[in-house]
Amino acid sequence: MRIIEGFRLRNVMGQATIVGEGVGQIDFNKLITLNDSAAYLWQSVEDKEFDVHTLANLLIEKYGIDQDTALTDAKAIADKWIEIGVVG
């Protein structure tokens, strides 16, 4: 998967927030904010192809968590990003 072109992570009033830049982005009814872990993952894979295992390995490297926990967390964030339409 890959972050869809035009979506960027910005700091909005101290919060890591996904914003759609440019024509053709979806109509947002709310801001999409990310916690520190999700923002770290976003920044790590921005402009790259990635999968759940890529995200899990990043979590393991950064936080030293076990593989099962990392895969569960990585799948949850990837599923959420797919659901809201910011990755494809």
Positions of the model-derived regions?
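Long, charge-rich, low-complexity alpha-helical segments
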Residues: 30-88
